[in-house]
């Protein structure tokens, strides 16, 4: 595959044991494990013809993920440090990377006198997972705090969605 020859800061591992990446410490190998350090690396990886039409699982903190001992016959994408950030925007809102731990978002909001994120302090996992599952507790959930999200499709296309366009559970 050409992707293995491309210069990337990301890592591609074959038959990587998944027990190392979830809280249950269970799971056999992933056929391909891709630790992504940039959007451009993910795009290159997804554009490679050898990676098309394969099952893909995007892994966050692994707090709500259970892999079979038989492994995963597909691609596991683990977002790296570039995707773990929280920053204050000029309009008073915050931008959060998908790999950012929920607790870090709650702490950042508290430090910046923003309310409505307190519930995240007791939810394990990342914001990416919180959005997918509409995580919440104590009468709050993440859908009440989102203005918009930006995603990368499995075809490598960046897409933005306003919160009212998202069908939360």
What are these regions (language model features)?
Residues 115, 145, 164-166:
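Short beta-strand or tight-loop elements
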Residues 3-127:
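Anion-binding (especially nucleotide phosphate/pyrophosphate-binding) glycine-rich loop
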């Amino acid at each position: 595959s050409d992707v293995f020859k491309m210069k990337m800061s990301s890592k591609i591992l074959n038959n990587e044991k998944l027990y190392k990446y979830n809280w249950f410490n269970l799971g056999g190998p992933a056929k391909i494990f891709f630790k992504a350090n940039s959007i451009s690396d993910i795009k290159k990886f997804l554009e490679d013809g050898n990676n098309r039409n394969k099952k893909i699982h995007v892994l966050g903190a692994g707090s709500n993920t259970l892999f079979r001992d038989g492994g995963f016959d597909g691609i596991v994408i683990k977002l790296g440090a570039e995707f773990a950030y929280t920053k204050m925007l000029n309009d008073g809102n915050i931008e959060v990377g998908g790999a950012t731990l929920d607790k870090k978002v709650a702490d950042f909001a508290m430090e910046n006198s923003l309310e409505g994120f307190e519930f995240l302090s007791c939810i394990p996992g990342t914001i990416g997972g919180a959005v997918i599952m509409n995580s919440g507790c104590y009468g709050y959930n993440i859908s009440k705090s989102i203005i918009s999200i930006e995603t990368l499709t499995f075809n490598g296309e960046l897409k933005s969605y306003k919160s009212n366009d998202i069908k939360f559970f």
